[in-house]
């Protein structure tokens, strides 16, 4: 009897418990990280970043046809089920204009990261095309290595370096380009000290000492920015006005519900025509993303049906 994970999107492939026997066949290195729970059930040693990376390799290969995936030490190793949820809810948002999920949607991933996780899932699940932006040259190199080592991805995913300090869409969205949606997992903390404290809490909760689990740290640009998440998303909202006719839906994850009111005020200030909040849940973890558009219903219908 497989237990259901509460709250995952109906199309998410990860509702059931992990089939560890199958995943170990897909990626044999996962076997060394298996442990037994107090109840005597087999599990993965989630406190070990190498175990989490091995699990991700197996999940991406088994469910998303990504045979070759790796990230450098010190970069965030994302939980696949939660990342897939964002993609599926985004698909529902894109379907509202025409009643069907567009098969040839063009998506911009702000901060694609070393793991390239959102494009990998979106290409496999919906056949979408992605542009991924990134400030870190090391993260960009890692993402490009993943794309280049998996057949077919070069045609579906392209990467761009954000060279302008503090810019989000400026310099990334070119003059004649159009995107059905943007997505983003913004940096959460407002300082390096806060980011370190957050990583330390995570280590303590997992029973690790200070030197363990470097992968739970993440790189500076992944974890914090001046002013934290609210300031980052406000900047995104401000810039989005300049691309109101080139992008149908702008979206971003918001880690805490209390961060929403100042963002709603910012969206009112820039004249967003429609604002949507999508609630998500993975186990005990609650998350959400907000979406906004400068197009009315008819304009969105025309945008979806445009020549591509």
Swiss-Prot record:
Q: What is the superkingdom listed in this entry's lineage?
A: Bacteria
Under Pfam families, the record lists:
Methyltransf_10 (PF05971)
Reaction catalysed?
Answer: adenosine(1618) in 23S rRNA + S-adenosyl-L-methionine = N(6)-methyladenosine(1618) in 23S rRNA + S-adenosyl-L-homocysteine + H(+)
Query: What role does it play?
Result: Specifically methylates the adenine in position 1618 of 23S rRNA.
What name appears for this protein in its UniProt entry?
Answer: Ribosomal RNA large subunit methyltransferase F
Keyword Methyltransferase, does the record have it? yes
Q: Name one GO biological process term.
A: rRNA base methylation
Misc: Recombinant protein is able to methylate partially deproteinized 50S ribosomal subunit, but neither the completely assembled 50S subunits nor completely deproteinized 23S rRNA.
Per the record, the similarity remark reads: Belongs to the methyltransferase superfamily. METTL16/RlmF family.
Organism per entry? Escherichia coli (strain K12)
Question: What GO molecular function annotation could you give as one example from this UniProt entry?
Answer: 23S rRNA (adenine(1618)-N(6))-methyltransferase activity
Q: What is its main location?
A: cytoplasm
């Amino acid at each position: 009897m497989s237990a259901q994970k509460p709250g995952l999107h109906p199309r998410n492939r990860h509702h059931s418990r992990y089939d560890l026997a199958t995943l170990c066949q897909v990626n044999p290195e996962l076997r060394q990280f298996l442990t037994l729970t107090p109840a005597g059930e087999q599990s993965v040693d989630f406190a070990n970043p190498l175990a989490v990376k091995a699990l991700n390799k197996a999940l991406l290969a088994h469910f998303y046809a990504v045979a070759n995936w790796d990230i450098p030490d010190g970069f965030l190793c994302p939980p696949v089920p939660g990342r897939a949820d964002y993609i599926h809810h985004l698909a529902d948002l894109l379907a509202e204009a025409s009643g069907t999920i567009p098969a040839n949607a063009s998506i911009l991933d702000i901060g694609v990261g070393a793991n390239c996780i959102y494009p990998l899932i979106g290409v496999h699940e919906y056949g979408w095309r992605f542009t991924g932006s990134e400030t870190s040259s090391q993260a960009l190199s890692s993402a490009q290595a993943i794309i280049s080592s998996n057949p077919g991805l070069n045609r579906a995913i392209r990467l761009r370096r954000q060279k302008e300090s503090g810019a989000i869409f400026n310099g990334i969205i070119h003059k004649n380009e159009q995107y059905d949606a943007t997505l983003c997992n913004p940096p959460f903390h407002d300082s390096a000290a806060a980011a370190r404290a957050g990583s330390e809490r995570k280590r303590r909760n997992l029973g690790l000492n200070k030197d363990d689990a470097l992968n739970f740290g993440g790189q500076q640009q992944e974890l914090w920015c001046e002013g934290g998440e609210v300031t980052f998303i406000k900047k995104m909202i401000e810039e989005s006005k300049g691309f109101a006719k080139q992008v149908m839906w702008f979206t971003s994850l918001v880690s805490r519900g209390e961060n929403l009111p100042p963002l709603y005020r910012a969206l009112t200030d820039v004249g967003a025509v429609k604002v949507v909040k999508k609630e998500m849940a993975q186990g005990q973890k609650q998350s959400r993303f907000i979406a906004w558009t400068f197009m009315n219903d008819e304009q969105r219908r025309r945008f979806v049906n445009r020549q591509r």
